[in-house]
């Protein structure tokens, strides 16, 4: 014979289908909230003079304190929310760029940095250059300049974060 207290304890931890669905919805909301609060970026250099790379890395230094926006640099595409791309896209690097983009989890965003990343820059009419990042992957934000200042790069990423917040 079971008592009321034993019955309550036994049934308290049984999973119900609606509990599981609620948990999935809550986890989805939690993941979205975390991405908005702390976007992780992946820096992808497709080639060129490296001027934009220096400015992107300068933007990540303590002087500019991008961590106040939650921005963190990650080494793996599987951990990144935003790809920050620099340099013109060549035929040789296009397949690698596409593969790395596909490895990023949804939702994923791309920021093209510099004249080369946006349009191909001075290399755009050469035989081996496809042009900017938008020829291979969808680009959400363009940050022109040769090279753009760290403040402009930070501003572009922050605008993307605001755009993401507005859409959710």
Where do the language-model regions lie?
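Metallocofactor- and cofactor-centric catalytic cores in central/energy metabolism, strongly enriched
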Residues: 73, 85, 90-93, 102, ...
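Short glycine-/acidic-enriched loop or helix-start segments at secondary-structure transitions
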Residues: 94-96, 121-123, 153-154
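Glycine-rich, charge-decorated loop segments at or immediately adjacent to ligand/cofactor-binding or catalytic sites
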Residues: 118-134
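A short, gly/pro- and small-residue-rich
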Residues: 96-111
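Short, basic, glycine/proline-bearing loop/turn elements
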Residues: 57-58, 80-87
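Hydrophobic cores of alpha-helical transmembrane segments in multi-pass integral membrane proteins
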Residues: 82, 112-113, 117-118
């Amino acid at each position: 014979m079971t008592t009321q207290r034993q019955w309550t304890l036994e049934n308290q931890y049984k999973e119900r289908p609606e509990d599981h669905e609620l948990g999935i919805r809550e986890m989805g909301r939690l993941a979205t909230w975390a991405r908005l609060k702390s976007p992780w970026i992946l820096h992808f250099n497709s080639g060129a003079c490296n001027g934009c790379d220096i400015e992107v890395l300068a933007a990540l230094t303590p002087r500019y304190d991008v961590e106040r926006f939650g921005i963190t640099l990650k080494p793996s595409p599987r951990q990144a929310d935003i790809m920050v791309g620099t340099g013109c896209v060549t035929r040789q690097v296009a397949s690698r760029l596409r593969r790395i983009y596909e490895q990023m989890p949804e939702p994923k965003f791309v920021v093209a940095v510099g004249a080369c990343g946006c349009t191909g820059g001075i290399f755009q009419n050469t035989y081996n250059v496809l042009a900017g990042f938008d020829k291979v992957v969808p680009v959400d934000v363009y940050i022109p300049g040769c090279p753009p200042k760290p403040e402009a790069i930070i501003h572009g990423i922050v605008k993307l974060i605001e755009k993401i917040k507005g859409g959710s």
